[in-house]
Amino acid sequence: MRVRRGLLRLPRRSLLAALFFFSLSSSLLYFVYVAPGIVNTYLFMMQAQGILIRDNMRTIGAQVYEQVVRSAYAKRNSSVNDSDYPLDLNHSETFLQTTTFLPEDFTYFANHTCPERLPSMKGPIDINMSEIGMDTIHELFSKDPAIKLGGHWKPSDCVPRWKVAILIPFRNRHEHLPVLLRHLIPMLQRQRLQFAFYVVEQVGTQPFNRAMLFNVGFQEAMKDLDWDCLVFHDVDHIPENDRNYYGCGQMPRHFATKLDKYMYLLPYNEFFGGVSGLTVEQFRKINGFPNAFWGWGGEDDDLWNRVQNAGYSVSRPEGDTGKYKSIPYHHRGEVQFLGRYALLRKSKERQGLDGLNNLNYFANITYDALYKNITVNLTPELAQVTEY
């Protein structure tokens, strides 16, 4: 009798264990789906931690090797004239890096092109992440008559090297936008760039489509001015260094290379998210962003593929110039796009079919003192893709 009861208990325990693990895995998958930003942040942090450990091990190995070589030379040179065996393992450190930024007494000429490395660009910026109302931001910048309606500004003491449209995808981040503008407007003014802000806001019930918003913003921005440089800027990314020049170049630019929530390390080499820049010519050549990425994730990886497929490489700022702080919880509430990997495998085939050339939309345009607001209700029917 006891043996029978034991046999009956075993399946029950196994069933309970199976139900427990099923419930746990289902809860985990649901969390990954509804809170992808948090999950991916932790995954990127773990990946960055692995990179940091690997780099530290390389550094330790190099230091040990250097110490062994020094000891060997020291023993050898104890009986030989030191001048016969010069030891200079740190010869590269003897050369001081000379600054390429112009001196404080640099003279501007109104008919000359603004330089890229100006004395007003000091480097690290004091970051203030505290919340601030848009009314306060309006009051702060209303003292500058050079800022025109919609946030248009250009220098008066030199000819701007680049005319830059700053495109910001937006949904329910009203507390983040004034924090970004508080830092970005003064930085761009110090860089002597002509610029304007375009906040592209998605309404409706569809999942957030960051890439399609960028395409809409591009089309609307080009109606205002013959911009030659485009900066695609997440609203929660605050630059920490004003020497991170927001002009464009011969190759597409990835500005946000070191984000605080990723331990200031690049999560992976193909990472192209946060803040990026392309010339208008480059953006048109790659057919813009893809429109098919509904939900969080994948569109910046597809942009990387498009850039590579078009024969470009990606440039990045050196050292700590590309450091950014991230306003927390930007992606909370945005669902994970589970179909992104299937689309990424077909990036090359889709590039000529999905982007600027299949984009349709209806925009409601309003003007703020500091930006142009472009409101759109996006649906998949507005950017249908033919078979490929």
From Swiss-Prot:
Listed cofactors: Mn(2+)
Subcellular location(s) of the protein: Golgi apparatus, Golgi stack membrane; Golgi apparatus
Pathway: Protein modification; protein glycosylation; Sphingolipid metabolism
Record's catalysed reaction(s): a beta-D-glucosyl-(1<->1')-N-acylsphing-4-enine + UDP-alpha-D-galactose = a beta-D-Gal-(1->4)-beta-D-Glc-(1<->1)-Cer(d18:1(4E)) + UDP + H(+)
Enzyme Commission code: 2.4.1.-, 2.4.1.274
Spans traversing the lipid bilayer: 15-35
Factors inducing expression: (Microbial infection) Up-regulated in response to porcine reproductive and respiratory syndrome viral infection.
SUPFAM superfamilies in UniProt: Nucleotide-diphospho-sugar transferases
Disulfide bonds, paired cysteine numbers: C114-C158, C229-C248
Residues annotated to bind Mn(2+): D236
Membrane topology of this protein: Single-pass type II membrane protein
Amino-acid positions noted as binding UDP-alpha-D-galactose in the UniProt annotation, renumbered to this chain: P169, F170, R171, N172, R173, F208, N209, R210, V235, D236, Y264, W296, Y329, H330
Binding site residues for N-acetyl-D-glucosamine: G298, E299, D300, D301, R340
Cytoplasmic topological domain: 1-14
Main localization of the protein described in the UniProt heading: Golgi
Record GO biological process: carbohydrate metabolic process; central nervous system myelination; central nervous system neuron axonogenesis; ganglioside biosynthetic process via lactosylceramide; glycoprotein biosynthetic process; glycosylation; neuron maturation; poly-N-acetyllactosamine biosynthetic process
One GO MF term: metal ion binding
Glycosylation sites: N77, N81, N90, N111, N128, N364, N373
Cellular component per GO, a single term: Golgi apparatus
Gene3D superfamilies from the UniProt entry: Spore Coat Polysaccharide Biosynthesis Protein SpsA, Chain A
Subunit structure of this chain's protein: (Microbial infection) Interacts with porcine reproductive and respiratory syndrome virus GP5.
Task of the protein: Catalyzes the synthesis of lactosylceramide (LacCer) via the transfer of galactose from UDP-galactose to glucosylceramide (GlcCer). LacCer is the starting point in the biosynthesis of all gangliosides (membrane-bound glycosphingolipids) which play pivotal roles in the CNS including neuronal maturation and axonal and myelin formation. Plays a role in the glycosylation of BMPR1A and regulation of its protein stability. Essential for extraembryonic development during early embryogenesis.
Membership in a protein family: Belongs to the glycosyltransferase 7 family.
Designated name of the protein: Beta-1,4-galactosyltransferase 5
Organism: Sus scrofa (Pig)
Gene behind the chain: B4GALT5
